[in-house]
UniProtKB/Swiss-Prot annotation:
Gene Ontology cellular component list: cytosol
InterPro entries: Anthranilate_Pribosyl_Tfrase, Glycosyl_Trfase_fam3, Nuc_phospho_transferase
Binding site for Mg(2+) 1: 90, 223
Details of cofactor binding: Binds 2 magnesium ions per monomer.
Similarity field: Belongs to the anthranilate phosphoribosyltransferase family.
Binding positions (anthranilate 2): 163
NCBIfam families from the UniProt entry: trpD (TIGR01245)
Cofactor(s) the protein needs: Mg(2+)
Phylogenetic classification of the source organism: Bacteria, Bacillati, Bacillota, Bacilli, Bacillales
Protein name as it appears in the record: Anthranilate phosphoribosyltransferase
Residues that, per the record, bind anthranilate 1: 78, 109
């Protein structure tokens, strides 16, 4: 196979060749062993940033050749893989951000390395995921839509067995948060591998994001944490990417270890999320949600600074608006709070 020879010679693939690569891996008629050979060779070579963009574009175009756009929308998510077993921070954040009037299209999955993935938590909360075709109406009515990654990209089921047979991480460990079916305006993306931060920030620029934050949490998490310096690459509206660190204590938040942020089963994480949204939780779990919500409010241009984002996120919780957003999503109330 020509692709195998190119990969053996460490030759960077073109967009057309990458599409062939994806088509091969997602073809159910090709046996898994042959797919393993190809993905193994791709994984052995150094993955270039351009190739990450090509892989993401190929997957999106395969499923959504006319990718829909929702102006002003944001997704807050992480790559997973940090093995921290934290509670569902980004899902909890999504309710708060949506309560600020920002359209949130959250792309999530079931648990892979944690006890409870985004979809697992939603099931426990009694909130259904939204079909891609129904997202515009869902956003219009409630301002927040949760999309199941497995439902929006069923072709990925043909790649899963291949990944399981390869012992090392592959490019598919980082593409999940990048293939939202909608062309987003903003994104906050947590990454477990700090060496991939700039690559992912550049890919988000290639995908047309107006603004984005790509971060690696202190001590290895794929969320901003309270335990030290969080590394950030920020894409601004001018297309510039800047690199800096943020520390929760600089914003008046108390230092806490990553272990203090651990969750549990979907049922246990449900109670954590509800306690935070209701304002009952005053612990570090609330603080880490406020910090991550602040980044989303900042990157989506709702506020001018991260500090202002922390103030607004706190108000959204304490005023009850975040809880109202949750109740709307569950169908408990229909009235909006302006």
């Amino acid at each position: 196979m020509r692709l195998l020879k190119q990969l053996d010679n460490n030759i960077t693939l073109t967009q057309s060749e990458t599409t062939q690569f994806i088509t091969y891996l997602t073809n159910p008629e090709i046996n898994v062993e042959d797919k393993v050979d190809l993905l193994t060779q791709f994984t052995k070579k150094e993955i270039k940033q351009q190739e990450l963009t090509y892989v993401v574009n190929s997957l999106i175009q395969t499923m959504y050749p006319n990718q829909p756009t929702y102006e002003g929308s944001i997704c807050v998510c992480g790559t997973g893989g940090d093995k921290s077993n934290s509670f569902n921070i980004s899902t909890t954040v999504s309710f708060i951000v949506a309560s600020a009037g920002i359209p949130v299209i959250k792309h999530g999955n079931r648990s892979i390395t944690s006890h409870s993935g985004s979809t697992d938590l939603l099931n426990e909360l009694g909130i259904k995921t939204t079909k891609v075709s129904e997202v515009p109406l869902q956003i219009e009515e409630q301002g927040l839509a949760f999309i199941s990654a497995m439902e929006s990209y069923p072709i990925m089921k043909y790649i899963q067995p291949v990944r399981k047979m390869i012992s090392t991480p592959t490019i598919f460990n980082i593409v999940g948060p990048l293939i939202n079916p909608f062309k987003l305006t903003y994104q906050v993306l947590g990454v477990y591998d700090p060496s991939r931060l700039y690559m992912i920030a550049q890919t988000l620029k290639d995908l047309g994001r107006r603004r984005a934050i790509v971060l690696h949490g202190a001590n290895g998490m794929d969320e901003a944490t309270l335990s030290g310096n969080n590394e950030v690459y920020e894409l601004n509206e001018n297309g510039d990417i800047t690199h800096y660190f943020i520390n929760a204590k600089d914003y008046g938040l108390k230092v806490a270890s990553n272990q203090d942020l651990q969750g549990g089963s979907p049922k246990e994480n449900k109670m954590i999320t509800l306690d935070i949204l209701s304002g009952d939780d005053k612990t570090c779990r609330r603080d880490v949600v406020v910090l991550n919500a602040a980044l989303a409010l900042y990157v989506s241009e709702k506020v001018d600074t991260i500090a202002s984002g922390i103030s607004l996120a706190t108000i959204l919780i304490d005023s009850g608006r975040a809880m109202v957003q949750f109740m709307k999503m569950r169908g408990d109330i229909c009235d909006d709070i302006k």
